[in-house]
Amino acid sequence: MNAPEKLRQHDRAARAVGNIVHLEHFNVVIGDQRLATLFYVVGLGGTRDPYLFMGLENMWVNFGRTQVHLPSRGTQPRPEVLRGTAGFVVPNLDDLVRRLEHAGTEMKRIAPELPNNFAFQRKGDSVEATCPWGNRVRCHAPAPEFGRTELGLAYVDFDVPPGTADGIARFYNEVMRAPASAAQGRATVGIGRDQRLHFTESAAPQPAYDNHHIQIYIADFSAPYEWLKSHDLISMETDADEWRFQWIVDPRDGRKLFQIEHETRSMKHRLFGRPLVNRNHALTNMTYVPGADAFRGTF
């Protein structure tokens, strides 16, 4: 029997997820698949997608319901670097440190001649790492702030110019229709169940934008598009279920605030909800248990 209406005291707004339902991947060009495999697969514990992009031109690495896309276009690719930090949830930080130590040793063994920015450090309740091309990663153990996720891309925290956080929050609230707020020089955007985008103001010099991107799925696919199109901000018309834009602007005055390409897809896109393979990265040939090949955590 349903409880009497007067006894129900739920904050329904607190359970809303907003218009951006999923942050699926970030994409950066890499210089060498060997080093990328050692960092993202051996070190961080991701799983190379076994079905798509199995050659040398690109590799997709699965982390729960999310991915990192790592194309290596051309014979001399120009690596791309996020202007910020990618935040992951991993099952166990102690295991992560051991994997990163091994990955670093292997990088020196197989490619000592290549420039390599790889580094990592444990800092309290997180592990901060840098990929061979300079992308910054921060890994966390599962925690209530990340919901029930035990493996996945939890957030991207961008470094943005001073004085832009309030306008960035307005952009996501008013244009993208996602819950966003700004406080103390930082804008935070809610995505889906437990993911976020952060935009943290920094006085440090900004490197030039190099065309890396993030990919999001949105529920209302038309209203943000119409606003962006009317302001001449659509950068690519991909197909019926995808468009892209690069500039975050203040909707009050149109001032350009930060450049990061958003690969924006509808929930009817052919890849939405695609099941991703995730291996049990603790398993080896010496510890193999039949039926334990797949990651059994929650994501």
Named regions from a protein language model:
Residues P162-R170, M176-S181:
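Solenoidal tandem-repeat scaffolds enriched in leucines and small polar residues
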Residues L70-S72, H198-E201:
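Active-site-proximal beta-strand elements of phosphoester/diester hydrolases
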Residues A36-G43, L100, G134, I168-N173, ...:
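Conserved active-site tyrosine of GNAT-family acetyltransferases
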Residues M1-R65, T75:
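Hydrophobic, helix-prone linear segments
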